[in-house]
Amino acid sequence: ELNSDHSNVIWAVHALTGDGQVADWWSGLVGENALYNYSSHFIICANLLGSGYGSTNALSENPSTGTPYFYDFPVLSTRDLAQSLESLRQHLKIEQIHTLIGGSLGGQVALEWAYTLGQRLQHAIIIASTAKTSPWVIGFNEAQRMAIAADNTWGQAHQDAGKKGLEAARAIAMLSYRNPSDINTKQKESEEKLDGFLAASYLRYQGSKLAKRFQAFSYWSLTKAMDSHDIGRGRGGVENALKTIQ
């Protein structure tokens, strides 16, 4: 539970397709007997704005129309996502955060938030992330969105629009997450095989697995937020912005 001086708050920020159930996907780090445990720490992980698991997203009701936003959902930035977490912190009356931790998109959001938290934050752990998204990553993200847009259901006003495209998008993403030598080793084939390769079935499995639990609208929104990530925008550049994070 939260101690009297709020010195035991651990705040995790989930990645692109993650959710607020941090102990489920980071069980080696968060849990009863983990480094960050519930007996010693007050652990928070909220679903990000735009996420398919909660908060407001493209399937939420647009108050102007009374119907879901779908393709009219506003473009988000990591700065917007960080501000939504800051609003939550203020609502919860959390005065300080001992450790803020996030990976990938979560790391980008954590960096943005660390900039604004100032002395309220003691430690930040940023994993597999960056202060500014590179053209290389933007290219991978665009290829994934092209896969979604190529699905003939994309453009239709229903929650499952773009599902098959999302499967292909996930396959593209998996190639960026894995090292070529790792795939060459783990998906190695016998010389006799002509079809049905392990690498192909692995990517199809990963695509199908994600599409069963996630929606293309959130994938689109959050990869767009990743594209525009730049902690130095309007702050004198990346180096100047990072210098303010103590």
Question: Where would I find each of the regions flagged by the language model?
Answer:
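Alpha/beta-hydrolase-fold enzymes
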Residues: 120-121, 126-209
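Conserved hydrolase catalytic core segment
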Residues: 95-137
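Structured loop/turn residues at beta-strand edges in well-structured enzyme cores
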Residues: 5, 92-95, 119, 243
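Conserved acidic catalytic loop of the alpha/beta-hydrolase fold
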Residues: 66-75, 79-99, 108
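Alpha/beta-hydrolase fold catalytic core
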Residues: 192-246
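N-terminal cap/lid subdomain of alpha/beta-hydrolase-fold enzymes
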Residues: 2-63
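A short alpha->loop->secondary-structure connector
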Residues: 62-67, 121
